[in-house]
Amino acid sequence: MRFNGFHAATLGILAAFVAVPAAAKTISVSATTPDANEKLQEALILAEPGDIVQLGAGVWKLVDGLSLDVPNVTVRGAGAGEGGSVLDFTGQQGAGEGLLVTSDDVYLTNFAVLNTKGDGIKSKGADRIVYHQLRVEWTAGPKETNGAYGIYPVESTDVLIDSVYVRGASDAGIYVGQSKNIIVRESIATENVAGIEIENSYNADVHDNIATKNTGGILVFDLPSLPMQGGQNVRVFGNEINDNSTPNFAPKGNIVASVPTGTGVLVMANRHVEIFDNVFEDNGTANVMIVGYRYEHKDPKYQPLPKDIVVRDNQHGKAGYAPKFAGGDMIAAAMGGSIPPVLWDGSGDAIVLDKVGVLSLNLPDVKTPQSEAKPSPADLSKGTPPAALPAIKLPDAMEAKVR
């Protein structure tokens, strides 16, 4: 009996020992070794949950994209500036992403991604992902051949994008699609077609960012024929949205190719969007545009109208002096040289409490061609705004990573 008891106890101890995961480790990767590129991808493959892949200072000249499919991994560089950790894809042979993440609880911080043929950093189906202090840039400036998206999480729950810089994306610098529970904050988007875009997503706070010198500063879209529809509950607040004057360089056929140069915030077919406490300045078409989806589609479930849009407590500087939509120049001339800061196509509903003018195109039916517009001033200050949206709260563990 004593033997059996001892044996059972020993087995219990061994079982407990086996159940304890290996201690998290730091995998350091240098940019200066002859096999630096291979070692970097190897580190991402061999990492285990809890590990840190530490990138040294230097430049990796990469010809292939990188991938990470291990959960709960941190990829940390030595900084996102020129003297930090730089992943340079100028010589990339394929057309894919620079870095693709497909696992949960990943933390990306303090490195740069340059000149990818495709998207800069993409995550797909990666819940609780954190993008922090990153730089994604196409260094030759705006070009149609640049990658589409800089920072690109899609199909995710709980997304935090904090203190990133994106320049030169031919679609959107910072894009979050088909996701829910999102915060985009304290970031800079410049010289992209769309600076920041929230598309077909639920529950997003976009705040304290700078969107400047894009074609359009911040876009909130809902599009047809996607698995997740009914985009709603988005707050755009506390942002500086100025001088979005870059000519549209999106490839033809992209939905953002229709964004007029000089757009501050553009809401298309979304529901319950609050735009408040922003500073607008020098957006040649409009500071705020609210429109329906006016393109052909074959999705019977799609709802193309903007609803419950609220615009309040914003500061409006110069706007509407160079409207880049069909007939905009003639409308501006007829109105003394510029159109009001807020432009509404007349579809859906919105409340504008800012003490500025609103121009309606009086096109309530999205099937009516824009050529039939009958522009006139509109008063959208009446009515009762919907209940204010709550702040987005992400898991404490995500916030702790960036503190």
Predicted feature residues:
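N-terminal signal peptide c-region/cleavage motif recognized by signal peptidases
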Residues: 19-21
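Right-handed parallel beta-helix/beta-spiral solenoid domain characteristic of secreted/periplasmic
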Residues: 28-38, 52-54, 72-117, 140
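Acidic, glycine- and Ser/Thr-rich low-complexity intrinsically disordered tracts
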Residues: 296, 301-403
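Right-handed parallel beta-helix
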Residues: 50, 78, 104-115, 127-140, ...
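Short, T/G/N/S-enriched strand-turn elements that build extracellular solenoid repeat scaffolds
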Residues: 38-46, 61-70, 75, 122-125, ...
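Extracellular beta-strand/beta-solenoid scaffold signature
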Residues: 37-41, 63, 89-99, 115-122, ...
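Bacterial N-terminal signal peptides that target proteins for export
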Residues: 1-10
